[in-house]
Amino acid sequence: FANSSNENSTPVGLNFSEAKDKYKNDNTMLGIDVSSFQGEVDWEKVKNAGVEFAIIRIGFGYTVNMDLVLDKYFKENLEGAKSQGLKVGVYFYTYANTIEEIEEQAKFISDNLNGEALDLGVTFDWENWNNFQDYQVSFYDLDNMYNNFSSLLKKSGYETMLYGSKFYLNNVWNTKNKNVWLAHYTNMTNYDKDYKIWQFSDKGIVDGINGFVDLDVLYK
């Protein structure tokens, strides 16, 4: 799902079986992240391909009409992944630029999760860097928005994670004491801070999914 700054996308499709050969070991789990862009997913086939976890888009916002939108496949994907025994988390693609908007979005997420158990918590995905100057917020303000998001969701029983590309994790975000989901499309990342998950390709090929899907490795 990443517009991962200037990191190059994987040039050609990467079969999940190849990814397993490269990255699967006793200390890792291999997974995917999905949204309505993937359409209907055959979760049984996904499980049989060797996928161990899925992070599912719960929604996004705001739209130009200032709406918060539930991903139309969110419930179906969450149920499907859980039915196959995959570990699950969700992510929210946010365009928020005030604490008030963060509060509204955290409530939207909590309301739609409605107590649903998550293994991998809720990820905060802010990538609207092209319009950053229009928002008149500082890097400190952005970090404060994440911290508020995290504290609000923890009150609802959910751990949180920060998603970002290598460039922005190094140059914008304060990653100290945060669970980090790194996006860096390369064979071997040289990102040298702590991270929990690495999204290494946006061109994954997985049985049960039409078209490309993001591939991720989780470190136990």
What are these regions (language model features)?
Residues V88, E159-T160, V180:
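Hydrophobic anchor at the start of a short beta-strand
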Residues F92, G164, H184:
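Short beta-strand/turn micro-motifs composed of small residues
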